[in-house]
């Protein structure tokens, strides 16, 4: 006979999934997405473009979009973004008002249907864990930067599966458009994909760097309302997650003011920082020194005369211009210890300043003398990491996406791939059995 408590337990077991489907919005949206896959055909003439999980629409996706909209009119482009009133979106609607594209709110039902039905999917980071690429779709991932900092499992103190969603995305991708061989190797190996990845990999430079090399400086100054009668300095420090916003704001204002004072009235210093810091600085009436989150950084770089950064990959994008780069790393030892670096900082194509006093002094060096001093380092980095950044990366990447011939396809494995699912891989007999079973395969 079933006891009362047992009956309640059985009832809960039966009703809990029903309650979750009715009340949990995430589960309902996931179910809707799967229904879209099941019930709809893939639209062969559609392209969905996404950048940085819909936070903005910039970088590689933005650069590719601008070429697609002009040169591939038979395709309908969809831009995924969280804020459909984003200033960049408004600019695009005005600039391309007669072109074949639409804007969709990120993770809305319309977005999920497009994710399920667009033939071409373009992303510079990753899709959410619920993403299931259909075999009829073509997923192009254009990773968002050459890494100075470690990635995936190479990050010091990283959790065992912290990189699981990036790994899944790269494994799902049909094509990876990489800026250089170094990035491809680090990205693939740090995400445990070496030897099992089946994606085609093309080395074409960063599509977004075309915007840095090919943009008209005066047009960009006007578009982003930047000063036109002074040299421009961009101060682009990395956001440190352990820092408080208030502390960061205070420190960055002090540092920016000191940089501006040192360079004098012939220069104007702009600060590009994290969204949280940006919002706080606007409240403090510091907007005349701020670059908003919505702007395309590579278009901004086309106007910049001197770059100050730290561990950000932005300096790789700026390097082809062969202008001065200064590295401001007051927390270098701590950052190397906690995060880890792929590159020897002694080889960087510019001077490292360990404190604001050193930076203020170093940025006053004469431009020609400074560039000559670091010429060997600059040329070495250009050869190793920027050799394909020649202003034609967008064209070559799109040819690659549309199945035109690619000269470089690396890491593509011809081996069969077997995936084991062992639940949580707990320390028990099931996990031990899977490990033992994995040893009987012929890996050659």
Q: Language-model segments: which ranges?
A:
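A nucleotide-sugar donor-handling region in carbohydrate enzymes
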Residues: 15-30, 146-157, 165-243, 361, ...
